[in-house]
Design a protein with these regions (language model features):
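Ubiquitin-like/PB1-type beta-grasp interaction modules and other compact soluble beta-rich domains
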Residues: 2-176
Length: 176
């Protein structure tokens, strides 16, 4: 009987240790004393993948980068990724009007919320099925999560708001 209890306790301790090890990789805290770092390409093991697709209105290649050790809101993810983002005069940090000076000021002055006549940016999040899903909330209120991809696509008039970035998602865990 004693050896059965002893083996049961050892087995329980092993199961708890395995569970902790598996869980600690996904919920590991970000060390805020280490600055965010940026690498080209999609994240493979940690961080937040950021995709900027300039759409069919531009010949610019898509920006694809992995931002590691970042904690904050999606709006601030642009700065961590060293990308220039501009809001509108009316909503300077509430509505993405221009990314990396696209569209140009001549095309969209960004004084008010851009309408569909000049095109606008659409914001997407990656889901567990490696699909882009249109975000129901904006970048200034969405908290970045390690292991979740964020994407932007510039849409021309007539394109569906559901038209996602043309970059395929890759599945990865969060091993910061």
């Amino acid at each position: 009987m004693r050896s059965f209890v002893r083996l049961s306790l050892i087995g329980l301790v092993i199961l708890v240790a395995i569970g902790f090890a598996l869980n600690s990789n996904q919920n590991q805290a970000i060390d805020e004393s280490i600055p965010a770092s940026v690498e080209a390409g999609m994240c493979l093991d940690a961080g937040t993948s950021l995709v900027v697709d300039y759409g069919s209105a531009s010949d610019k290649p898509a920006e694809v980068m992995c931002v590691k050790n970042f904690k904050g809101y999606s709006w601030d993810l642009f700065e961590a990724a060293e990308l220039l983002v501009s809001g509108t005069d009316k909503y300077p940090v509430g509505f993405v009007c221009r990314i990396e000076n696209f569209p140009s000021e001549e095309v969209e002055p960004c004084s008010e919320t851009p309408g569909t006549k000049n095109g606008s940016w659409a914001y997407f999040l990656g889901d567990e099925n490696n699909s882009w899903v249109y975000s129901p909330i904006g970048a200034s209120t969405h908290k970045v999560k390690c292991g979740v991809s964020e994407g932007w696509r510039f849409l021309l008039p007539g394109e569906s708001i559901q038209t996602p970035p043309r970059i395929s998602l890759k599945s990865y865990g969060c091993n910061n």
